[in-house]
Amino acid sequence: LIKKAEIFPIEFIVRNIATGSLTKRLGIPEGTVLEKPLLEYCFKKDELDDPLISKEHIFTFDWANEEEINIIDKMTLRINDLLLGLFRGIGIKLVDFKIEYGKVWNKDIEKKEIVLADEISPDTCRLWDVKTEKKLDKDRFRKDLGNIIQGYQEVARRLGIMPEETNISE
């Protein structure tokens, strides 16, 4: 089901393990397991490299109100819980992920409601093998760690959505 959504100009990032820009910004060692999920917000503006923002920025510039952010925070942390369990069950660590939300009109309740308006995939998540910490996501491309398709296929195989043998070429 696809609906046109009014997208919030915010990327919502959940971090379970320190890596990437978090380690660069704060000097935290790569791979540090965070005591609880860290929720970050970035302003969606490619020409500004999607800068990190606070809730105060969001409210001051009217990108969302407090009620909307509270709803989105709860949804995002719930999605994190679900994904942590899903990936843990197939031997993958969910390091972090980013998602976006929007508002759509719900005729049943006659008001706009907040919906997840983004994909959840190895393009939007950092996924590491539990035993080897091998990267199974877009970092394979970013860090020149090998064929990105192989990582994506490995995730798909573990999820049971791709057969062991495939004709997808590298």
What spans do the regions from the language model cover?
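Active-site loop/lid in soluble adenylation, ligation, and acyl-transfer enzymes
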Residues: 1-43, 159, 168
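Intrinsically disordered, low-complexity acidic/polar segments
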Residues: 23-24, 106-108, 125-126
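Residues forming anionic-ligand binding surfaces in small-molecule and nucleic-acid pockets
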Residues: 35-66
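A long amphipathic alpha-helix within ATP-dependent nucleotide-binding catalytic cores
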Residues: 63-95
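Residue-level signal for pocket-adjacent positions within structured domains
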Residues: 12, 29, 33, 48, ...
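Conserved metal-phosphate-binding beta-hairpin within the catalytic cores
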Residues: 14, 94-118
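C-terminal helix-cap and adjacent tail motif
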Residues: 120-170
